[in-house]
């Protein structure tokens, strides 16, 4: 086989394969195969739905953004541990270097 005939032979083989692929018998068998898989594709689509999962640690109810109950005031508004009058009612707010109250944070 000469090198000049090789491209012609390759084009002839691909054209013959294309004609065979477009034959009515082959198209009919492809349609029949794809229609028989139609029922299977519906089953696959149904199985892709996620199952119900248990509620996770970070899944919070809708009303979680509401503020929790505020801490009770000290008697006579004086902290019995630090003897501070009118101070914070919870743990020391500056223990991490910033003051946080009702979602507002002020860095010292």
From Swiss-Prot:
GO MF annotation list: enzyme activator activity; protein folding chaperone
Main localisation: mitochondrion
Cellular localization per UniProt: Mitochondrion matrix
One term under GO cellular component: mitochondrial matrix
Quaternary context: Interacts with SDHA in its FAD-bound form.
Task performed by this protein: Plays an essential role in the assembly of succinate dehydrogenase (SDH), an enzyme complex (also referred to as respiratory complex II) that is a component of both the tricarboxylic acid (TCA) cycle and the mitochondrial electron transport chain, and which couples the oxidation of succinate to fumarate with the reduction of ubiquinone (coenzyme Q) to ubiquinol. Binds to the flavoprotein subunit SDHA in its FAD-bound form, blocking the generation of excess reactive oxygen species (ROS) and facilitating its assembly with the iron-sulfur protein subunit SDHB into the SDH catalytic dimer.
Protein name stated in the entry: Succinate dehydrogenase assembly factor 4, mitochondrial
Gene source species: Homo sapiens (Human)
Lineage, uppermost ranks: Eukaryota, Metazoa, Chordata, Craniata, Vertebrata
């Amino acid at each position: 086989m000469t090198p000049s005939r090789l491209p012609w032979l390759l084009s002839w083989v691909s054209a013959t394969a294309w004609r065979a692929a477009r034959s009515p018998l082959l198209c009919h068998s492809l349609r029949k195969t794809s229609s028989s898989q139609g029922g299977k594709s519906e089953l696959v689509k149904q199985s892709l739905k996620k199952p119900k999962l248990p509620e996770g640690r970070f899944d919070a109810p809708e009303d979680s953004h509401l503020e929790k109950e505020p801490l009770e005031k000290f008697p006579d508004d004086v902290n019995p541990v630090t003897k501070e009058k009118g101070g914070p009612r919870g743990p020391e707010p500056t223990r991490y270097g910033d003051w946080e109250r009702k979602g507002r944070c002020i860095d010292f």
